[in-house]
Amino acid sequence: MSRFYRQGSSSESSSESSSDSDVQVKKPTRYVSSSEDEIEEKRIVLSAKDKIWQQFDESLKKVRNALKTNDWVSTTSEFDNMTKLITNGKTTRIIEKEGFPPSFIKALFIIQTSHRDLTTEQKKKLHANNNKSYNSIKQKLKKTCDLYAKELKPYHDNPALVNEQENKANSDDDDDDLSESESEESESSDDDKGKGKGKAAFGKKPATKAVVAKKPLTKKGDDDSESESEESESESEELISESWSSDSDDDSDSDSDDDSGDNKWMIKDDKKVVAKASVTTVRKTDKDKLDRRNAVVSPLSGSGSAVPTAGEGEGEKLTQDQIMKKVKEVISNRGKLKTDPMKQIQQLEYFYSLIQGDKETFIVLYELIAAQFDTASVKVALSIPVWQKVADGIKKLLEILETNTNFVLVLEHQEPTISKGQVAVTGNLLALFEMLDDEFSKSLQSINYPTKEYLDRLQDEQIILDLGESLQKYYESAGNNGAAAKIAIRRIEHIYYKSSNLKNNIIPSTMPLSEQITLMSKLSSFVYKFGDERLNARTILCNIYFNAINNKFHEARDMMLMSHLQDNPTLMDVSTQILFNRAMVQLGLCAFRCGYIQEAQNCVVEFSGLRKDLLAQGLSVQSKTAEKDTVREVEETTRILPAHMWIPIDLIETVNLISGMLIAVPQNAYRPFDNKFKTCKFYQRHMDSVDRQIFIAPSETSKDIIYQASKALSAGDWQQCLEHVNTLRFWSLIPDIDSVREKLTRIVQEVSLKTFLFTYSTSYDSILLSELADRFHLPKSQVHSIVAKMMNNHEISASMEHSTESITFRAEQTKLQYLALHYSESLVDFVEQNERIYDVKFGTSYRKKGDNDHLPIAGGQHHGHQHHGHQHHGHHHHNQQQQQHHQQQQQTTQHHHHHHQNQNQGNQQYQNKKHHNSNQQKSHKKRQNNSLVVNN
């Protein structure tokens, strides 16, 4: 074509554009063109008001969708966004001119009514996060609704206004769309009449393509269809865009030749079509998306009336093979990085509603259950509705297997060995059952205890028990006894801790004790026969626990000793170690209830204090300086048992302290200075810490009360001791209180009698048995038995007088007396040794000379003895002569001779006195060793 014609066409188009300035027409380009490029859409510039109003409209839609599924987490999020947006400065200025946005008021009204009308049953089904959001929005919603009470009043008076306005708007839009599509079809039909036989001279296919996918007429009030279809918009948009892009490419290629030549002469008519198409596109931007989704029905829509198609543009229904092919595609994407589990669940649920045939139904349902488990995580459990769906799904799988006896269940990586007529189906119902059980325990961990919600959730335990019984029967009939044994131990673990006797059990066993014993025996025998070593150990521990809570101490103790599990508990896995600890603690509590104090103390001694982690009732205590191990913390958190299975730590500590008191008090009275006999270290540490205090406060805690009881018991006041013990709070956790108190009273009386004899036996020569019986309120025969046993064990030195029914105590020295005597003997030996050393070093003559200076002292010590009177007089006369000699320095020979005679007599007197004292001490020591009578 010549350049002249092209210039003419451009001038013509410019003149047209000046007359119609609202529509911009793009020049047709050759070789690079597409149907979508030729449809020019107007870019609408929204005002600030329209933008804000549009945000509120979107929030209203999200709120509606969230409330349909009781998703209060999303509702709270949208509510917070709207309240922030409504208080924005720009929004406030617009509201002053235009008023409040209707969508905001509608959203407030919808949230308020939904929050108010939520039933109790619906509240029970909310999971933890959802329930938290439901409670948190209550106060915020009340404050906000009070601020906008005037605007909310019309909707309260007539709630139908919320839907009427939207239905009216939707119907108007549908009428406009219908009229526009009809006008476009009429125009396109007029253009088709003016075409040549093989070419489209005037009309453009892209203009008609934009309205090919018509939206069918909908009824008023059908606004929910848009929100439901939006859930699957992201998936179906890709499918639709591919089909549209392929169609547009084909059309652009086929029409590329038609854009030359004659098209340039008919540019005026062409512009009208383009202009009309652009206007239609601008007004139907959102509607076209929904129309295109309706043009090709997606299997994700989930609508019962929708007809699935085999291809993007084909109208054929999906066959069973095609459905299974799509199911495999969904399964292949499971677990990938950007895969949404919720969307996969929606897809599988839709395919499950379409599938036919038992085998295909089993496969789709099994994969659906596996996908539902993917919604849980390590810390977050399955929501209660999903958990119940999974339980129902497992029941349906089991029904399919029981109905079709020719179906053989095989594992995924197992080669099936089937005979003629049998059908192999892949699945592992045991794994599904174990995961369902674990999710149930995890769900209980996330609920506060004890609350009504916890009790309601705990009622679902019966679902697991019934399902486990059915699965065990199926595996037994299938010959898979190993899997049946694993299910049996799961059933045992839901039964062994229940007893109608336990007060701290939140749900006592509704089954009679005889039936419960029979069931435990039956399941245990099956596990012993077909289970492995680990399952057998767990079964034994569960039976020990079960016998202990039913006060069968001897059976539980014998089972523990015969199994030898206490020899190497560290070789077990962690969960089995926890079960072993629980069995030991419960065995100790049983021994305490039965009156076996020593056995009770031996069992619970290692579990007092902050050792909750040993019983899976809390996290382990770490030092403040230690680094936080998140991996270990997560592992311990997952191992924590549900709260209704816990053994109260206060009960364990109180039993340990009382047992320690009844053991340690008589031991301390018998051997007060021997630390090796202090076996109850936990009790002794507490007593020592209180004794070190300067001021002891009144008793408030259990430990303080037991301290006061110990002091009373040490003094032999058993009545005061019992008064303190009876005020403890642990009695509310003890079943059969009267029987336990009676046994404990008898034990306290016996211990008080022993302590009294150990402490005050040295103060009595003899005592009557009747007096002891009256003092401690014990039968005379029992007192006789206790005293005889103490004498037989050489704990007291006494003899029994049967004629007078009295006890005669033999004198025995106390520890203090023994130490004093030993000290005196050491002093005597020390003096004698010093004298021998003195004689060796200085000689006897020097010591005699030294004694002369001290003779007056030696003589003075025995002044008053008659047979030494003359010697004393001579010695005194010697002192006078010696003084005169020093004063006058004159001495006669006769007096000098008399002086030496008196000196020799004085030395002889000192030696005799020393020998007399030594003999007296030795004889006194001998008398004390033979018999020492102490009178206090």
Curated annotation (Swiss-Prot):
Keywords: Cytoplasm, Initiation factor, Protein biosynthesis
Record-linked InterPro entries: EIF3C, EIF3C_N_dom, PCI_dom, WH_DNA-bd_sf
GO biological process, one term: translational initiation
One GO CC term, this protein: eukaryotic 48S preinitiation complex
Entry-linked PROSITE patterns: PCI (PS50250)
Region (Disordered): 1-38, 156-265, 283-317, 845-936
Domain of life of the source: Eukaryota
Compartment(s) of residence: Cytoplasm
GO molecular function (one): RNA binding
Domain PCI, chain residue ranges per copy: 643-814
Pfam families xref list: eIF-3c_N, PCI
Compositional bias ranges of the Acidic residues kind: 172-190, 223-240, 247-260
Compositional bias segments (type: Basic residues): 862-879, 912-928
Ranges of compositional bias, category Basic and acidic residues: 283-294
Compositional bias segments (type: Low complexity): 9-22, 199-215, 880-893, 902-911
Family membership noted in the UniProt record: Belongs to the eIF-3 subunit C family.
Record's function text: Component of the eukaryotic translation initiation factor 3 (eIF-3) complex, which is involved in protein synthesis of a specialized repertoire of mRNAs and, together with other initiation factors, stimulates binding of mRNA and methionyl-tRNAi to the 40S ribosome. The eIF-3 complex specifically targets and initiates translation of a subset of mRNAs involved in cell proliferation.
Subunit (UniProt): Component of the eukaryotic translation initiation factor 3 (eIF-3) complex.
Record-linked PANTHER family: EUKARYOTIC TRANSLATION INITATION FACTOR 3, SUBUNIT 8 EIF3S8 -RELATED (PTHR13937), EUKARYOTIC TRANSLATION INITIATION FACTOR 3 SUBUNIT C-RELATED (PTHR13937:SF0)
Identification of the protein by name: Eukaryotic translation initiation factor 3 subunit C
Gene name of this polypeptide: eif3C
